[in-house]
Structures are given as structure tokens and as C-alpha cells.
Design a protein with these regions (language model features):
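Helix-loop element at the rim of GNAT/NAT acetyltransferase active sites that forms part
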Residues: 23-24, 31-43, 169-179
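Conserved beta-strand in the GNAT
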Residues: 56, 62-71, 78-84
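Conserved GNAT acetyl-CoA-binding A-motif
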Residues: 78, 105-117
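Conserved acetyl-CoA-binding loop-helix of GNAT-fold acetyltransferases
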Residues: 85, 91-104, 121-125
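Ligand-binding pocket scaffold of soluble enzyme catalytic domains
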Residues: 18-21, 26, 31, 56, ...
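Short loop/turn motifs at secondary-structure junctions and domain boundaries
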Residues: 45-51
Length: 181
């Protein structure tokens, strides 16, 4: 990581240009996330842009071909996320190029990320080490079966006054405070 990351890169037959994540069209960013099967809504992506920093790769006609973000948690810790490459251009160096920009921004910080199976080789090549396995489950919430006879603890909507307790619970589980989120 001694040499600075370049501002453009030839990928396949496309010349890519780096830009800030804030400059990216939200609908193009959403389309990029959908192209890899991520269940993010446009409003989720906007929230991530407001909380984090990062980069996108654009081709000469302005199409987004990749993204990478980082999220500061205090002065010495950050998480990395939203590392996406267009399926057509995966394995051509776009993600690594964007990660070089992110890692340059994060110098001196402890970093954490969740890697998909497809991205593990990239992160390993950047000297990240596996720590634990995380399983992500997705589904549709359905009403509870009224015929269930098992006692269930009461469930209620989280309110504003619950935020401090939730942030403390999250900090204990995650290992660092994310109260700003």
C-alpha cells in the first residue's frame, strides 16, 4: 500500500474513473446492489451514504461498475462495506482498486468487515484475517400462529427511550460503540 491508488484504471476494455460515493446516482447505486442480489432499498443506500464515506467506479459514459465504503466509529476504528462489483466485471480488479482508495483513507484505523464467500479471496489478498463466521438470513415476516400454545415473551415496538439500551447491547456484541448510527 505504498503507492497511491490511481484515479483511473483500464478494466477489460473499459476505462474506469473513481468518484466519491456521494456523487453517485442513487438509482444506479441501487441497481448495482440488486445486480449482486443484495436486499437493499434505495433509502437504505441513502442512509449508508449519510453515515459513511467511499468511492464508486464509473465507466466513460457514467455507468457505475463498482463501489466500496467505510464507516468511521470514533477516531481509530472503522468498518468496511458496500464493496460491490458489477457481475460482468468481477475478477478484473475493480474491487481491489476501490479497496485501495478505502484503505488509504483508513490508514491508522483498526478495520473490520463482513466478507461474502465471493469476496474472501480479495480480502485475504489485502491481509485481512478471518475471525468468525456470520450467517445472514432473510425472509418474510408473517403473523404468529394464534394456535401456538407455547408461552412467548411480550414483544413491543422499540421507542426512542430504548435507544441507549439498544446501543449498549450492540456495543457489547459488536465490540465498539456504533451509537452514532
Amino acid at each position: 500500500m505504498d503507492a497511491p491508488a490511481s484515479e483511473s484504471k483500464l478494466i477489460d476494455s473499459f476505462k474506469m474513473h473513481v468518484a466519491t460515493i456521494e456523487s453517485a446516482d442513487l438509482e444506479q447505486l441501487h441497481a448495482l446492489s440488486v445486480s449482486v442480489g443484495w436486499p437493499l432499498r434505495s433509502e437504505d443506500l441513502q442512509f449508508l451514504r449519510e453515515c459513511g464515506r467511499g468511492y464508486v467506479a464509473r465507466d466513460d459514459i457514467g455507468r457505475l461498475t463498482g463501489s466500496a465504503m467505510w464507516f468511521p466509529h470514533g477516531d481509530d476504528f472503522a468498518t468496511i462495506g458496500m464493496v460491490i462489483t458489477s457481475p460482468r466485471l468481477q475478477s478484473n480488479g475493480t474491487a481491489r482498486w476501490l479497496m485501495e482508495h478505502v484503505l488509504r483513507d483508513c490508514l491508522g484505523r483498526n478495520l473490520r468487515l463482513n466478507a461474502t464467500r465471493a469476496s474472501r479471496r480479495l480480502y485475504h489478498s489485502l491481509d485481512f484475517k478471518p475471525m468468525r463466521t456470520i450467517y445472514q438470513c432473510q425472509g418474510i415476516v408473517r403473523p404468529a400462529d394464534s394456535t401456538t400454545t407455547t408461552e412467548q415473551p411480550p414483544v413491543r415496538r422499540l421507542e426512542g427511550e430504548d435507544l441507549v439500551a439498544v446501543a449498549e447491547l450492540d456495543a457489547g456484541a459488536f465490540g465498539v460503540s456504533r451509537a452514532a448510527l
